[in-house]
Amino acid sequence: MLTVQNLSFAYGAIQVLDDISMGMPEGRITCILGRNGVGKTTLLMNIMGLLRPTIGAVYMEDRDLTDLPADKRAAAGLGLVPQGRRIFPRLTVEENLKVGLSTLGRRASKIPGEIYDLFPILKTMSKRMGGDLSGGQQQQLAIARALVGEPKVLLLDEPTEGIQPNVIQQIGAVLERLVKERGMTIVMVEQYLDFVKEIGDRFYLMDRRRVVASGLTSDLNSDLIHRHLSV
């Protein structure tokens, strides 16, 4: 479904990503792991088109997205939930969700009922300002806003960061449901290993700008964790 091919990226003279290749299969949850500062967020931004790689390519369903800007990639079926949620605090929950409809152009003007089915709390709080929500509720809103755009591939950057355990469980259940019912492809940067092992199918482990290991999440062993994830 989604392929990153020999992708490198630099901020000026500072190399951040070096020859990254990944394949994210359709209808699976692929987790990107690594310590802080290894380039995970930068990789997602390159996939989404918010940054342009120095060299390399990004494909979705064999379509080359490399030269497309972020809005065209969104229209092609990519959705991003950025780190830190980035909801609009002075818009209501409903207005935040309607922002996600812009991806669909004139095809839709109403929030799908399924969104509120996935996140019932958002229906209850639809008239509340986004800034009044708790951190966990804001994360649910950020995910819901991305889903309004009907992505085929959902990119999430640390969706459990700063979130209480019960909301993490709810988010995990939603992601598993999206895979099971929609066949959605999910790519998730994540540091919470218990969450990765619970819902993830495959992983790529990054260190020093490169992919150093990959496989099934069940293959994540103590040696890999100690060498590449322990602080």
Regions found by a protein language model. Name each.
Residues 148-152:
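A short, proline-enriched helix->beta-strand linker immediately N-terminal to the Walker B motif
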Residues 169-182:
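Helical segment within the ABC ATPase nucleotide-binding domain
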Residues 56-63, 76, 108-111, 117, ...:
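Conserved ABC transporter NBD signature motif
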Residues 33-35:
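The feature captures the beta-strand-to-loop junction immediately N-terminal to the Walker
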Residues 48:
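Helix-to-loop junction immediately C-terminal to a conserved catalytic motif
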Residues 91, 133, 146-147:
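ABC ATPase signature
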